[in-house]
Amino acid sequence: TFLTILFCSKYKTADERPNSSVNNSLFVKPTKAVMALVVLTLSPMLLESASIDWSVIYMRDIFFTPPFINGMAIVMVALTQFSVRYYADQYVEIYGTEKVSKISVMAMFIGVVSVCFSNSPYLSLIGFAFIGGGSAVIFPLAMSAAAQKIDRPAAINVASLAQISFLVFLLAPPILGFIAENFGIRISFGIGLPLVIVSWFFISSLKSK
């Protein structure tokens, strides 16, 4: 708390900007372009949420590892996610959103396969690291792409994407928990595998139109 106050004490809120949109509805219907971005973000949002809530339980139930090793699962997710988000901007500027997104999706694929089929706790930890890094920047890139669409005001497109993506983020833990209870926790993470493959085919939706 002290460090947060120290680093944020000089921050000032931005001036309120005029909003040209008159849409005050609680639900903003996504356009086809925004819906493509929603599909793209399904896998990173689901896997991020699943890893945060279920990675420790996965390690405990599958490998019966000590609490310290169990906790390392979520540490690996958070550490790689933070690192990728911190350094991603410069790589996006150099290589572009499409190439960075492809690398991210491939990283998620490697991570999910490792977690689903691993017979070693350390390989699973590496898998969680790949999931954290792979899921780090796709949603921020999708939000940026939604804001750059010219068919509607940026605020509407961003809200449309955010409301559905965060709904997935919030619903993922209980749904995956139900799957884990009835079919096994490996299967609950495996649900993300087809979604990762689908995300690969929607990377082109990040292009500005």
What are these language model-derived features?
Residues V84-T97, A180-E181:
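Helix-to-loop junctions at the C-terminal end of transmembrane segments
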Residues T1-P18, F202-K207:
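C-terminal membrane-cytosol helix-exit motif in multi-pass small-molecule transporters
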Residues K99-S114, L193:
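Structural signature of the two symmetry-related core transmembrane helices
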Residues V137-I150:
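Intracellular juxtamembrane helix-capping segments at the cytosolic ends
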Residues S9-L37:
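Juxtamembrane intracellular "pre-TM" segments in multi-pass secondary transporters
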Residues I150-I185, F189:
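A late C-terminal transmembrane helix in Major Facilitator Superfamily
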Residues G111, Y122-F130:
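Paired small-residue
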Residues P30-V75, L79-S83:
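Extracytoplasmic gate region of multi-pass secondary transporters
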